[in-house]
């Protein structure tokens, strides 16, 4: 049976990638269907109850700058907020929020149900309708056919999902949910490279059975940070603490004695796990010299006693899990509510995708999230927003969009994936970005909101707030530039006394703010400056203090822009370019980079090869011009 209405975009999956994809397409005005196997799990946090962190919060802020839901839901569901790396430079500062699972999911559901142009339908997708290498729709579990020319797949860990606890395993998409087997088989029939990855989760603990008095309390920051540029503190729920404890020699003995019962170390699990979020058995094996590892005890919500012991993800048998947990200080009498487990799932080589996240072999088919080999809610949400945006642009007959590496962490993420691929779950870090002083979390809106407005992703409320902020920054910079302080005046003496730096001559406030020892808040207090919005003050201070470094990065970006903007034809025959080695010809033909800049980032492609490519492109262009003039 065919569904009576046709859609422009269909999104399969209602996790972090799927919700952002569906919302993005709908915000852009196209008729969008969100297909989920269970409406009750829309926006569910399947793993740890937290959003943000180093590199990750940059993605969340970028999603927010483009009108996405993740930051707003975090502000409404966050029960502890902290700024990480607060004593370091602004490039690596990151916001992290502990979230109440129920409140977060409810916030996402509310946003979805109130989004115009978005329809939600509960059914598992079993098949894709493909005609002449173009996607045409989706077939559900009950045989219902939905038609659309753009389909976004955000399947998470559900494709061929296999859950492991000890040497026992069973099919599942996550604990309590069935896997997507029919769709996994269908996708394996397509000419796409497929692999297996693995992730895991720790046992959940009943907080009433834990002794917090022997643990270290970890409170949130005051005043509480906000994740969204439009966030308001009055929307944040009650704030509570996390706690820290440690594994010990006894814990490590228990694990070492039972590695033969681990599916990871007995060869049962084929998939590669996340390097930066290893299981506790992996930590003990890889870091055998360490006597202990931190365990962060994270509350799962305000209305539950369940705790998430971050740091002891495991797939060991339940009896071993119980021994591990009870060997840890403060958890000697702990009751496990849910056992930890590992899950294996299918992913597809992201080098088979375009920058738009559309597959190269099936027109209109987009992939986002863990299906592309990434790990993390934030990485999934960022890909989802981009895929949904490009699916909508395709439906509108417009050119696809993806930010460059120098414009957004989303650009870094996508470029890394489609250029380098990944053999293990990919996690974002600030260290992956060459231009991280420009790509700060605090200026994501200044980098992206204008483009989001142009694309149709940003609504009137967000645009008005953004314009007010941007204008406020200009006004404040002008005020500081035109306000002068002279030595020997009360203000000049106060500045000298406060910062221990006598004024040698007359300075404007912007010059003074550029000094590392002078901060904006103190300067505003001494000079009795008018009150300014915190976001405006932050931008003015960072731009002023880091102006020289920022200018140098901008100059470097300008120098490299030519190669980034030089497009490589999709039909370019690399084997016909003389001077390229067979190895480089193979790598270029296998990856089929979209630009000269991307080609240069493929491992093994040398600067000399890039020069040969550039010469070939110039000759090709000249030849085409001659043909046209003939």
From Swiss-Prot:
Residue sites binding NAD(+) per the record: 273-287
Alphabetical keyword list: Cytoplasm, FAD, Flavoprotein, NAD, tRNA processing
Gene Ontology cellular component terms for the protein in this record: cytosol
CC cofactor: FAD
UniProt: FAD binding residues: 13-18
Domain of life the protein comes from: Bacteria
Disulphide bonds in the chain: none
UniProt GO BP: tRNA methylation; tRNA wobble uridine modification
A matching Pfam family: SAM_GIDA_C
PROSITE patterns named among the record's database cross-references: GIDA_1 (PS01280)
Molecular-function GO term, any one: flavin adenine dinucleotide binding
Main location: cytoplasm
Gene3D superfamilies (UniProt xref): FAD/NAD(P)-binding domain, GidA associated domain, C-terminal subdomain, tRNA uridine 5-carboxymethylaminomethyl modification enzyme MnmG/GidA
Localization annotation: Cytoplasm
SUPFAM superfamilies: FAD/NAD(P)-binding domain
Family statement drawn from the similarity comment of this UniProt entry: Belongs to the MnmG family.
Function: NAD-binding protein involved in the addition of a carboxymethylaminomethyl (cmnm) group at the wobble position (U34) of certain tRNAs, forming tRNA-cmnm(5)s(2)U34.
NCBIfam families per UniProt: mnmG_gidA
Subunit structure: Homodimer. Heterotetramer of two MnmE and two MnmG subunits.
Protein name: tRNA uridine 5-carboxymethylaminomethyl modification enzyme MnmG
């Amino acid at each position: 049976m065919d569904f009576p209405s046709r859609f422009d975009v269909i999104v399969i999956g209602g996790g972090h990638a799927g919700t952002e994809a569906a919302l993005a397409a709908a915000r852009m005005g196209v008729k969008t269907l969100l297909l989920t196997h269970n409406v009750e799990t829309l926006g569910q946090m399947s793993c740890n109850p937290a959003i943000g962190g180093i590199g990750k919060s940059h993605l969340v802020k970028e999603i927010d700058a483009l009108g996405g839901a993740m930051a707003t839901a975090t502000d409404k569901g966050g029960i502890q907020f902290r700024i990480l790396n607060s004593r370091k430079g602004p490039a690596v500062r990151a916001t992290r929020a502990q979230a109440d699972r129920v409140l977060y999911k409810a916030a996402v559901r509310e946003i979805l149900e109130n989004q115009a142009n978005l329809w939600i339908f509960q059914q598992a997708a079993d098949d894709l309708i493909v005609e002449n290498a173009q996607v045409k729709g989706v077939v559900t579990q009950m045989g219902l056919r939905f038609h659309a020319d753009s389909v976004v797949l955000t399947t998470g860990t559900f494709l061929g999902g296999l859950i492991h606890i000890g040497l026992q395993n069973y099919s599942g998409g996550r604990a309590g949910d069935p896997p997507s087997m029919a769709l996994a088989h269908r996708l394996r029939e397509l000419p796409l490279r497929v692999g297996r990855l693995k992730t895991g989760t720790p046992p959940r603990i009943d907080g009433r059975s834990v002794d917090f008095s022997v643990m270290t309390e970890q409170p949130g920051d005051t005043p509480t940070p906000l994740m969204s540029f439009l966030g308001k503190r009055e929307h944040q729920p009650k704030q509570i603490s996390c706690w820290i404890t440690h594994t010990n020699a006894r814990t490590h003995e228990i694990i070492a004695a039972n590695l033969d019962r681990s599916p990871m170390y007995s060869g049962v699990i084929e998939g590669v796990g996340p390097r930066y979020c290893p299981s506790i058995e992996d930590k003990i094996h890889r870091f055998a010299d360490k006597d202990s590892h931190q365990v962060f005890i994270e509350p799962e919500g305000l209305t539950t006693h369940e705790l998430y012991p971050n740091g002891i993800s495991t797939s060991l048998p339940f009896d071993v899990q119980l021994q591990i947990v009870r060997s840890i200080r403060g958890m000697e009498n702990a009751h496990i509510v849910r056992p930890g487990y590992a899950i294996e799932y299918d992913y597809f080589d992201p080098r088979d995708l375009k920058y738009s996240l559309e597959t190269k072999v099936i027109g209109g088919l987009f992939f986002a999230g863990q299906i592309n080999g990434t790990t993390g809610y934030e990485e999934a949400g960022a890909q989802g927003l981009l895929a949904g945006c490009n699916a909508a642009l395709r439906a509108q007959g417009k050119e696809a969009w993806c930010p460059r590496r120098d414009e957004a962490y989303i650009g870094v993420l996508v470029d890394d994936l489609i250029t380098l691929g990944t053999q293990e779950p990919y996690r974002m870090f600030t260290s992956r970005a060459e231009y991280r002083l420009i790509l700060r979390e605090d200026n994501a809106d200044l980098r992206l909101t204008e483009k989001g407005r142009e694309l149709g992703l940003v609504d009137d409320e967000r645009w008005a707030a953004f314009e007010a902020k941007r204008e406020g920054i200009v006004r404040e910079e002008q005020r500081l530039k035109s306000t002068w302080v002279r030595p020997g005046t009360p203000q000049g003496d106060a500045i000298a006394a406060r910062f221990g730096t006598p004024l040698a001559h007359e300075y404007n406030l912007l010059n003074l703010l550029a000094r590392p020892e002078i901060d904006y808040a103190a300067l505003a207090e001494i000079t009795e400056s008018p009150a300014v919005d915190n976001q405006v003050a932050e931008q003015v201070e960072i731009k002023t203090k880091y102006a020289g470094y920022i200018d140098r990065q901008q100059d470097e970006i300008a120098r490299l822009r030519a190669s980034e903007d030089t497009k490589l034809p999709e039909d370019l025959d690399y084997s016909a370019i003389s001077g390229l080695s067979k190895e480089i010809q193979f790598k270029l033909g296998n990856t089929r980079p979209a630009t000269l800049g991307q080609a240069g980032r493929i491992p093994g492609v040398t600067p000399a090869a890039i020069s040969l490519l550039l010469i070939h492109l110039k000759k090709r262009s000249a030849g085409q011009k001659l043909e046209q003039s003939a």
